[in-house]
């Protein structure tokens, strides 16, 4: 089979067919401002890391409800939508381990890691893609390498909100094992997980208790 392209036309063995249009690149979002250095007694600095590439989907709905609940409880909340930031995968060069945590890669990750350092609580929000967290969140986690020693010394809390369109009972087994290991490795306290399976669309999940549960998760943090 011989393939060739000319403009928006794809030729297969000399026969011209219309080529599928390339989807537009995602619009990069600005990162949120840093957390306040001083915060009211009993209130928390909460960083929400949301991995969905769909701004009007199930994952975004639950993330938004969580943020609303946390803010209404008086907490200081920052949110990063990792699919819309410049996040590259770790190269495994270990330059950072020999150079005081500085990474060779120039992207948004150092600024995001700084927000994580400032936060008391880190909430990961993700769709399930092939029984794993979204690739943008995974890439960010890999880049923890440059701060892992510092993170291990910080008594943080972490939580998880995950959504899966499939209905298998074991849909969350792999990511639960991952987050068990992550919590254990970093020494961060696991404060809870909200996992919804069998809801592929926003309309589906709006009919359930999960949006309310996400709100309560944020509101009841302490």
Question: Model-found features: residue ranges?
Answer:
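Short beta-strands and strand-loop turn motifs
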Residues: 49-50, 125, 160-164, 194-195
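N-terminal beta1-alpha1-beta2 submodule of the flavodoxin-like/Rossmannoid cofactor-binding fold
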Residues: 6-125, 131-147, 208-222
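Short glycine-rich anion-binding loops that position phosphate/pyrophosphate groups of nucleotides
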Residues: 128-130, 165-166
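A short acidic, helix-capping loop that chelates divalent metal ions and anchors anionic groups
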Residues: 163, 198-203
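Short, solvent-exposed loop/turn segments at secondary-structure boundaries
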Residues: 170-173, 203-208
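A short beta-to-alpha transition loop/helix N-cap that caps and shapes the active-site region
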Residues: 86-89, 167-169, 201-202
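Short beta-strand elements in bilobed, periplasmic/extracellular small-molecule ligand-binding domains
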Residues: 76-80, 188-196
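Short, glycine-/small-residue-rich phosphate/pyrophosphate-handling segment
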Residues: 135-136, 149-192
